[in-house]
Amino acid sequence: MARRRKGRPIDGVILLDKPTGITSNDTLQKVKRIFFAQKAGHTGALDPLATGMLPICFGEATKFSQFLLDSDKRYRVIAKLGERTNTSDSDGEVVETREVKVDRGQLERCIAKFRGTTDQIPSMFSALKYQGRPLYEYAREGIEIPRESRKITVHSIELLRFEGHEVEMEVHCSKGTYIRTITDDLGEMLGCGAHVVYLRRTGVSDYPMENVVTLEQLQALRDQAIEQGIEPGELLDPLLLPTDSAVQDLPEANVTVEGGDAILHGQPVKASQLPEQGTLVRITVGEQRDFIGIGEIDQNNMVAPKRVMANKQDEA
């Protein structure tokens, strides 16, 4: 007999403002406990040093978390020139100190070289896996693992402030871009070394930063609910964004109620005004535009289901 999953079966996305000094997974577990959720997962780890937007998906939304993992990110970073560390941030040990002889013009010319699509070699102090273990575990043991470079795209990188040995920048980049690595590479270009002292993620996909909430705010709502003798979910759940917010960038394919039933049973259906073959679409049903999953336009110009909502299948 299958063991019953502990927690509430809730669906949706919460935009957490991750605090510094804690891992993304520890943050996830705290949020999961506050909501008493059955199932939850985050959508792209932030370094312990980093703060900012960490979308956490609950229940059915976890099926679509890959779209947030693959989406563009935005960051605000402050780098310190003159010191290089083994982790490329201030959590590591200083391994080299050099004199800083940099003017603003030189700095802006070097920053400009990061714009566009380039190859980046991930840091050893990253969560990328090698033989089932994250690279940072090998790094802590003094083991260097060969890493292949990966294509990244920096859509924009702007210098906001240059004071003394501090450089503040704003970066809009593709998934898999390591800001620590950009900072370390910038320091080497400038000939003085550099490392990250502050990093804040200010955007994931098109989610607005004003929707983020802190752990303290969530805990306060839970405590308030308990004090008032009501279910914590009554105060917490209104903060959840809808499940389909994770796939908001996909074009919509609106099908009839009958078509929706067919989709939920694994059958492709016809719909009007569809994009070209091979395009992933967000499937909605009827005039209410109720989200039921994602599909792909097949060779017959029909909407073929790829991933659908289990709770909608139960209703179909």
Curated annotation (Swiss-Prot):
It comes from Photobacterium profundum (strain SS9). PANTHER family: PSEUDOURIDYLATE SYNTHASE TRUB1, TRNA-PSEUDOURIDINE SYNTHASE. Responsible for synthesis of pseudouridine from uracil-55 in the psi GC loop of transfer RNAs. It comes from the Bacteria. This is tRNA pseudouridine synthase B. Signal peptide: none annotated. InterPro entries: PsdUridine_synth_cat_dom_sf, PsdUridine_synth_N, PUA-like_sf, PUA_sf, tRNA_psdUridine_synth_TruB, tRNA_sdUridine_synth_fam1_C, TruB_C. Belongs to the pseudouridine synthase TruB family. Type 1 subfamily. Its EC number is 5.4.99.25. The keyword tRNA processing applies. The active site is at 47 (nucleophile). Keywords: Isomerase, tRNA processing. Disulfide bonds: none annotated. It catalyses: uridine(55) in tRNA = pseudouridine(55) in tRNA. Coiled coil: none annotated.
